[in-house]
């Protein structure tokens, strides 16, 4: 019922729905549609132009109507939304048969919002058309107006004034200084809308990022003070603002972001306050080569983990990973020779990629970001048993060690990779058990991190944030464990858990301190 209400509402979002396995006499959807998931994004036509496409079977030419209409954005993975028709032609011409154009001008891209319904409650994955420019109320009133410039990944701005923070639509990933100018343009539209101006500007702590440079230019142009907020702290603050919290513990798992120590953070346990944070735990770091191929080859990431441990892969393992011995030797040489120019990363998403390869369900190449996460989620959702009912031979594979380093806890997954290197090729029907066992281990790791933080903090409220906690299997498992141990858990609902929500947390911190 809630999904139906959302689909028919004026907001007209895309709603994430689970595929039905049994459709009776109805024609099933082709497996080519979203093959990496058991879900589909479904929406009704939100405009007259799209409704005409749905209704075209009534045209005089007698062309057959659609059984279903599959759409996707014009922006390639990692690219910002595009408005210029000539640029759209250039982007899509190589793999497009025909273009259907219109002469309506678009001031700013504001695509459909994306929602999911879980346990009867709506969660916003992409806050855009229909929700923007509605504000996020919080427990308090901002003593000053704030303009927040978000981050480069899933860029968005927010304008905080009075008792609410108004985040913009997601703009996409910024790849140049010129592309970042749209942040100032969108902020100025919010200023016109509210008839108010910011008293200060806030941006990401990485001052070399395009969004931070644009924020600095805007602040200088208008003679405004500029402050910074670390990205993972802002993740936590966004969820805290939504629930009216001033301080809490936070688990933030995502694809990585700038850390104050010069490393890439991405699997963090923080004590979060409006005026700062303490970092208590993270996953063990690894060297990440700054090459596109390293992100596209899950098998390579798995083998690099073994290289770090000092374990040579067997011939059987290389065959299972579909990697030639000579190719592995080249990867090993490049990895060892290039580590002094690498980024040291704690990002949780790379753990997903490597584990997906170790289980044997990863593709040879990841053609889009977070692909392994979706594949693991697909198989884990198919698992018919609870985490407690998973046979021990599966659960024991995903082992981790916890070590303490000067009031800082490290979750080391080395034993997981050693175990996965020794398994026999799993059967297809075992993949759900492997995936669900991995999720159970991640939840256990989250509990271990929060338990360590509780040695130094009296906080019992825990917020879950970051892209990986958009995965309901992980968020549910983690919330259940933490609740059983006496914590009160808060999750995103009105705000996205990914980087597009960071601007809200930035505005909350800067405006209230």
Predicted regions and their residues:
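Active-site-adjacent structural elements in enzyme catalytic cores
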Residues: 1-202, 206-217
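Conserved phosphate/anionic-ligand binding catalytic regions in large, soluble enzymes, centered on
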Residues: 48, 68-80, 254-264, 338-360, ...
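Short glycine-aspartate micro-motif
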Residues: 145-148, 202, 248-252, 463
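A contiguous, well-structured pocket-lining segment that forms one wall/lid of small-molecule binding clefts
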Residues: 151-190, 312-314, 321-322, 326-344, ...
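Short glycine-rich phosphate-binding loop at a beta-alpha junction
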Residues: 195-208, 226, 457-470
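Conserved phosphate-binding/catalytic loops in two-lobed NTP-binding clefts
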Residues: 222-235, 460-465, 472, 478-502
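Glycine-rich phosphate-binding/hydrolytic loop that grips phosphoryl groups
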Residues: 232-253, 257-259, 298-307, 432, ...
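Short beta-alpha connecting loops at secondary-structure transitions
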Residues: 278-292, 333-340, 487-493
